[in-house]
């Protein structure tokens, strides 16, 4: 009989538990764990006996392999219900969705690998592939045959615990921002892909755990078909935070995709000035420059000094994609030139913007087709293009990444779908 220091959870599940006298305490139903120190550490056991569920902790518990038969032997049992725990393995993890942080995807837990570390049992890995499922249901030979037929290696897919994030919320006292801190380290586009694979409850929990900036960046990356359901489930506070960190051009795009309660919820949470600006953006026809322009840009007067400009930028703390170009305008907001951030930082602080600006600037009319903005961005290698009205007054900019995200990418996706 061999004592096991590493084993799979489903191998011990529903097995008899014996006390030191050889009597059966019951069958293992579930295991309580806490993640206070990282890896889920076993702190208690649910045992089923005669239709009743009992709760135990053991002074000593060992798992043995007796010629292929699993035995669980214990000493010093006491009935106790853990007051604080993070998960029940069967109820909250087994067969549930979990996020593979490295693979940046949602996977299903088919088994859990448990190891004895410093005298305590801990979950060290998640088994997520089909191999674990075949083995668990006792059809491993059938699985091997299938894999051989499709010429794939029959290998376990084990994800180490530090590389996964559970979606279950058991401890309601746990801060949401702490609960999903691994997910928050991912790129917004990867988080968006993960959210799209979750059900609405899980999606709401994860999204509300993100900080304000990350939530806004992630929301921008989410496919339009999911945005309405997210807005619908968000609290009023979180909705207001989200909108506050979104550009009005993005809000206008969002409103075009929403209707009914979801649309009203957005409008109610907008400040008056923002609502007016969004309404103005919504008037533009699709595929015109105005429909994808943003009103967030930096515009300063001809006589503002370099030193004053730098102080203004520090106070504004603008997004990096709008601070690269500073547009120089006259008293009537007509564009007279542009200052690149690099030139600003390398110039004498006492001179005016008019002395270092490039006055040969390319602009595009707000009613022009988006294709014209694309052409000018490519021809002059611009990160953003100034948008002017019929009086040549600066009213917005078109960012190159908005051209890609809101115009070129949807066209590419539509073409590939067909």
What do these predicted regions represent?
Residues 66-70, 77-84, 88, 92-100, ...:
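Hydrophobic packing positions in regular secondary-structure scaffolds
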Residues 1-62, 88-131, 337:
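Short beta-strand/strand-turn micro-motif
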């Amino acid at each position: 009989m061999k004592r096991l220091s590493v084993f799979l959870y489903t191998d011990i599940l529903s097995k008899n538990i014996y006390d030191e006298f050889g009597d059966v305490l019951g069958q293992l139903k579930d295991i309580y764990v806490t993640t206070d120190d990282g890896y889920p550490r076993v702190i208690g056991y649910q045992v089923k006996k005669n239709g009743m569920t009992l709760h135990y902790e053991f002074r000593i518990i060992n798992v043995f392999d007796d010629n292929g038969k699993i035995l669980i032997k214990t000493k010093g049992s006491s009935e106790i219900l853990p007051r604080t725990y993070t998960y029940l393995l069967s109820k909250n993890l087994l067969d549930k969705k979990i996020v593979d942080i490295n693979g940046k995807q949602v996977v299903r837990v088919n088994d859990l690998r448990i190891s004895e570390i410093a005298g305590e049992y801990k979950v060290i890995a998640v088994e997520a592939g089909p191999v674990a499922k075949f083995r668990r249901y006792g059809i491993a030979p059938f699985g091997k045959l299938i894999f051989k037929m499709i010429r794939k290696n029959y290998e376990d897919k084990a994800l180490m615990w530090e590389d996964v994030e559970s979606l279950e919320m058991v401890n309601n006292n746990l801060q949401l921002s702490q609960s999903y801190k691994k997910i928050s380290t991912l790129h917004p586009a990867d988080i968006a892909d993960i959210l799209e694979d979750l059900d609405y409850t899980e999606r709401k929990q994860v999204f509300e755990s993100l900080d304000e900036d990350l939530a806004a960046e992630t929301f921008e990356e989410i496919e339009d078909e999911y945005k309405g359901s997210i807005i619908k489930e968000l609290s009023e506070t979180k909705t207001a935070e989200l909108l506050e960190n979104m550009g009005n051009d993005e809000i206008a795009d969002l409103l075009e995709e929403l209707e009914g309660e979801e649309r009203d919820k957005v409008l109610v949470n907008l400040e008056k000035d923002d609502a007016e600006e969004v309404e103005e953006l919504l008037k533009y026809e699709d595929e015109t420059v105005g429909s994808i322009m943003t009103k967030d840009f930096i515009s300063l007067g001809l006589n503002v000094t370099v030193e004053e400009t730098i102080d203004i930028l520090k106070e504004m703390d603008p997004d990096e994609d709008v601070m690269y170009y500073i547009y120089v305008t006259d008293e009537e907001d007509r564009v007279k030139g542009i200052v690149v951030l690099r030139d600003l930082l390398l110039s004498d602080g006492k001179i005016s913007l008019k002395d270092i600006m490039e006055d040969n600037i390319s602009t595009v009319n707000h009613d022009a087709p988006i294709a014209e903005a694309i052409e000018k961005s490519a021809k002059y290698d611009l990160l953003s293009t100034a948008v002017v009205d019929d009086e040549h007054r600066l009213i917005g900019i078109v960012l190159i990444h908005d051209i890609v995200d809101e115009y070129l990418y949807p066209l590419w996706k539509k073409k590939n779908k067909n």
